[in-house]
Amino acid sequence: MKENTTFFAPMIYQKQVAPAIEFYKNAFDAVVLRQWNNDDGSVHVVEMSINGALFHMHEETTRNNELSPETLKGTSIALGLFVEDPHAVMAKSIAAGGTEIDPVQDYDYDYRQGTLADPFGHHWVLQKKIGK
């Protein structure tokens, strides 16, 4: 990735980061780029990439109300992930422990997409542009 380029990199809050790292590796072929641990060895922050799409995960913190969906009992956003084959990624994600919310289907706005919940409560919209 070029330095000084504007791009979007979400920060995903988790109760525990380590189990989420393993899920994203198995479900999305994510790779760990950098990781910072707490004194007790638990993961504090991790920088990851899914096929070049950068994101971070951080332990939830009540200090700034940066909380996980588990604590909130819901989520306020869905993370859109553009992939070559939404059906295949959905199947792989379910096998890794995710739960299908909406099956992958084609929409009249020229997207093929489906939604899943990861084991930590985050919603992912797996999608591909199929029209013009």
Regions from the PLM with identified roles:
Residues 1-11, 22, 28-84, 90-117, ...:
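Vicinal oxygen chelate
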Residues 14-16:
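Conserved beta-strand-loop-alpha-helix junction that forms the acyl-donor binding cleft
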Residues 120:
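C-terminal catalytic core of tyrosine-transesterase DNA break-rejoin enzymes
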